[in-house]
Amino acid sequence: MTIASSNGSNYSQSPLIPDLADAITPRPDRNTNNGRQADVFPPKEEHIEEMKDAVRKIILGVGEDPEREGLLKTPKRVAEAMRFLTSGYNQSLEELVNDAIFDEGHNEMVLVRDINFFSLCEHHMLPFMGRAHVAYIPNQKVVGLSKLARIVEMYSRRLQVQERLTRQIAEAIQTILEPRGVAVVMEASHMCMVMRGVQKPGSWTVTSAMVGVFQEEHKTREEFFNLIRHQPAFF
């Protein structure tokens, strides 16, 4: 499910509509190229000079002087920033989880909500940022709570579209835990809609991905949506 809204919408809160939740069909970790998995490799150190040269060309392209004092170190700074913002390519799900899976016999919903995230839109390489809500219903096994936030972080630190990002997080949790169900909702503001193009400050996009009982059972979805709408009393 994907929901987009902007100022002037009739919704007073995120319009999460359980009946429209989508099922997930597993697919490759990254986007595909003509049906084949795209050739994407972890960045190499020698590429940093190529990135710096590219930034210099961009500076020239916008009519600036890359040799003036304020811009002398900009290519290096931008290259390093891009490496950080896409550091998720250097991580793998197996290394991230690091065997932090435990047999607890727990079979009720586990939810980590309001996980702040930042990512880069792959179309314009502009930021989008927001909050993720991640839940699963264990099949006896649980994972360390921080790992759910780290999974969100790993996939966010790549060139992304929000729809795929949401799906990848759900599929990752399904892969490591084989739970009875997984639910992920992400709410984000996209700078490519705010700073350029349609230029709509205040617009936001909601995406959801449902697996297993969250997709199959209305009551389970409704419980999840109610929990992420609920405002904790201790904050």
UniProtKB/Swiss-Prot annotation:
Keywords: GTP-binding, Hydrolase, Metal-binding, Nucleotide-binding, One-carbon metabolism, Zinc. InterPro entries: GTP-CH-I_C/QueF (IPR043133), GTP-CH-I_N (IPR043134), GTP_CycHdrlase_I (IPR001474), GTP_CycHdrlase_I_CS (IPR018234), GTP_CycHdrlase_I_dom (IPR020602). Pathway: Cofactor biosynthesis; 7,8-dihydroneopterin triphosphate biosynthesis; 7,8-dihydroneopterin triphosphate from GTP: step 1/1. The keyword Hydrolase applies. GO terms for molecular function: GTP binding; GTP cyclohydrolase I activity; zinc ion binding. It catalyses: GTP + H2O = 7,8-dihydroneopterin 3'-triphosphate + formate + H(+). Its EC number is 3.5.4.16. Zn(2+) binds at C121, H124, C192. GO terms for biological process: one-carbon metabolic process; tetrahydrobiopterin biosynthetic process; tetrahydrofolate biosynthetic process. CDD domains: GTP_cyclohydro1. It comes from the Bacteria. Residues 1-42 are annotated as: Disordered. It is an enzyme of class 3 (hydrolase). One of its GO terms (cellular component) is cytoplasm. Residues 1-15 have a biased composition (Polar residues). HAMAP family: FolE. PANTHER family: GTP CYCLOHYDROLASE 1 (PTHR11109:SF7), GTP CYCLOHYDROLASE I (PTHR11109). Homomer. Belongs to the GTP cyclohydrolase I family. This is GTP cyclohydrolase 1. It comes from Nostoc punctiforme (strain ATCC 29133 / PCC 73102). The lineage of its organism: Bacteria, Bacillati, Cyanobacteriota, Cyanophyceae, Nostocales. The gene is folE.
